[in-house]
Amino acid sequence: MTSADATNATLVQALRSGATSVEVNGVRAIVARSFLQRAKGLLGRSGLEKGTGMLILKCNCIHTCFMRFPIDAVFLDPKGEVVKTVRGIRPWRLWVWGGWRARMVLELDSRNTAAQ
């Protein structure tokens, strides 16, 4: 088992246990699990602190309507493996699709990840 596999297994185990926050590739992420949490996502926020994000479960497509800042989206499969990354998604983008394999998305403030 590689270190990436171990990290992914830890993520999946934390999600199955009902964790409200998890670590994904060094990012501390709030987990949006319920319908209302997933629908709201990052709406109403002016940004995120560096090293933080939101992990939206049961999601393979996002929008940035009503967002106040650009985001980076990292789409993950059920095992926690990255299937697609989209950087610099501006507010008011109507449709960003992660692909058929995506089951969750990690949203990050792209103003904090520009140098990475």
Question: Language model features by range: what are they?
Answer:
Residues 2-116:
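Compact, glycine-rich, soluble single-domain proteins
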